[in-house]
Amino acid sequence: MNARTEPSEAEPGATARPPLVRELLLVVGLFLVYKFGRQLVAGHTPEAFRNAGRVWDWERALHLPSERSVQSLLLHGDTLAHVANTYYATVHFPATVAFLVWLYFKRPAHYVWARRVLASLTGAALVLHLAFPLAPPRMLAAAGLVDTAKVYGPSVYGPPQTDTLSNQFAAMPSLHFGWALMVAIGLIAATRSRWRPLWLLHPLVTLTVIVGTANHYWLDAIVAAALLGIALAVLHAPRRTASTAGPAREKLAPATSEKKNVLVGAGR
């Protein structure tokens, strides 16, 4: 027979998709530990404001630009401020979930890597929240910033004294920025499109929003980026192969001449 059957070989970089139920329980469990763990410093108001003053002074000592320069861009009209508040309130968590879901079904190897990196980043953030409670700049009188969510809406926070669903003194580091940066890095690593660097617009817009709405200091984002860098240095991304970074369009070489040579040789 001329037809040959060759066993298919598994791609060296291929990774089996983890069981879905286990992953759901793991991710939800880790998030709940973080969510409830950071509530432990919710009542540390005096310390949070002292740390806010320190961070503000550190930024001036480092000659970082004032957060007012970014906020002034959003205060040219009610619409822009409202859009920024909406982005802050609605994009952060759904974008990260969508990122993990897509990786789980399309790039299992990158999913495992991204989940580990995000878990490490979030765990390190929780430690910092507990060790360094920090009031956001919108609460710091010395900053002279507008609480855009309170003035223009929508707001995801209530008064700190009565808000039991969130810890508003967990500003350092900014997981809004840390997660957004990981989403961009993960999608760049997991895809092949020449347009994939555009994913960096997500953390760039997020940085503008969190600073412009006075929810975070520059240092909150800098520390988040540093923690993410450490996690990425320890947890390496999967090697890029056809199975880990998506199928690439391949050119098939014509086999007509080869078949002719085989047939001619067989008749001699």
Q: Where do the model's predicted regions map?
A:
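N-terminal transmembrane-helix/juxtamembrane module of multi-pass inner/ER membrane proteins
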Residues: 2-94, 267-268
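Interfacial helix-loop-helix junctions of multi-pass membrane proteins
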Residues: 134-143, 167-171, 205-231
